[in-house]
Regions:
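Positively charged, Gly/Ser-enriched RNA/tRNA-binding surfaces
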Residues: 1-30, 40, 74-208
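Short, conserved secondary-structure transition motifs
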Residues: 36-49, 64-70
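Acidic, His- and aromatic-enriched active-site or binding-groove loops in soluble protein domains
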Residues: 51-74, 163-166
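Short secondary-structure capping/junction motifs at helix and strand boundaries
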Residues: 28-34, 53-57
Length: 208
């Protein structure tokens, strides 16, 4: 686990992603992908589509299955959960139009005006551009609006390491600015990243 406490800016996310990817690069892992999103973009997309706020968790649980059941499966489950077909179609249309880069973030910035504070989209673009500018390992960083990271305590950017040779995620994290304050009474911004070392070791052993 790596956590940075007390840093309110996106420097924390940039440092965490670079530290983790540099480590993976030193272990000779290549061509993996950092999937990145922001919980506030997730919520803004749900609000724009007309889903009631109290149902967001249900929407995100279903969205999180996108990799397994695809667009049609997500649409079917959302409608079976009682959501209006119009809202479901409006919601999924955005995912079809968003590209996995800063242009996709810009799309969200403009499309979700009135639902999303533009500084959140700008912050995500800064993270992506900064990581691409100074990274030393061979990997891609991709905006993925379907990335949910199940924990509801995340408050901002969230990210995951997707490794093709493993066929899944080998680590992830995000910003959780409210959690420490709930336990200590002292509001402390925080951002963390964890790696599944067992999976990494398994991949290293398989490689040898």
């Amino acid at each position: 686990y790596i956590d940075i406490l007390g840093e309110p800016t996106n420097l924390a996310e940039i440092e965490l992603i670079l530290a983790t990817t540099t480590l993976l690069g030193k272990l000779d892992f290549k061509n993996f992908t950092i999937r990145i999103n922001d919980r506030r973009i997730l919520k803004a997309m749900a609000a724009y589509s007309g889903f009631p706020e109290e149902s967001y968790d249900t929407v995100f649980i279903i969205l999180d299955k996108m990799d397994k059941i695809g667009f049609e499966g997500v649409a079917k489950e959302l409608e079976e959960a009682g959501f209006a077909k119009e809202s479901v179609e409006k919601y999924l249309k955005m995912f079809e139009e968003i590209t996995p880069d800063t242009a996709g973030v810009e799309y969200c910035r403009e499309k979700l005006e009135g639902f999303l504070d533009k500084e959140y989209a700008d912050g995500l673009k800064t993270i992506i551009d900064s990581v691409n500018a100074v990274k030393t390992a061979e990997f891609k960083i991709a905006f993925d609006p379907t990335l949910v990271r199940g924990m509801s305590y995340y408050t901002g950017p969230i990210f995951e390491i997707a490794m093709d040779e493993y066929g899944g995620s080998v680590g992830g994290g995000g910003r959780y600015d409210e959690m420490i304050g709930k336990f200590t009474g002292n509001q402390t911004c925080a951002c963390g990243f964890s790696i599944g070392f067992e999976r990494i070791v398994m991949l290293l052993l398989e490689r040898d």
